[in-house]
């Protein structure tokens, strides 16, 4: 029991590592909270610190979720689902003890959790994400739509044995929780989308006609 408790705490602390914030401060002498959206996640890192830093933060944030999900396997822990460890990593990412309980928007770390538990389900979500990104040129909208399609996937796929071969109650609960976290963390982005002033990536069709302010 003690090892389980310690690993659960470790999962939160792993997720809480603010790679974007630390990379910005150490290598660029910039505090991401003072630039752009003020967020320390992948998207703001790309915009403020550049492509290399953005890729690094994305990979690190993704691996936080994956590693946390794999901890029970690494330490031969039975009786507790790997998804619980992954969820704690996402909570750590969004409410980091190392960053005054601030954090990112949970997309990359949530993707890491899904990668560690169901890679094909993540592939399905990645296709949705890329398609929406190309059509509308907004990472925020792509993230929210992918979260919604994750909810649809856990409801529909088990009925057809497609990607998810059986209905997994805990997986469904965790996916629901991750989707709600992602959507909630993007509430300001959704307001900007409504006002047609959301930030855009420099490619895609921008079908909604957003104009950055």
Curated annotation (Swiss-Prot):
Listed transmembrane segments: 3-23, 48-68, 71-91, 119-139, 144-164, 165-185
EC numbers: 2.3.1.275
Topology versus the membrane: Multi-pass membrane protein
EC main group: transferase
Biological processes annotated in GO: phospholipid biosynthetic process
PANTHER family linked: GLYCEROL-3-PHOSPHATE ACYLTRANSFERASE-RELATED (PTHR30309:SF0), INNER MEMBRANE PROTEIN YGIH (PTHR30309)
Protein name according to UniProt: Glycerol-3-phosphate acyltransferase
Organism: Lactococcus lactis subsp. cremoris (strain SK11)
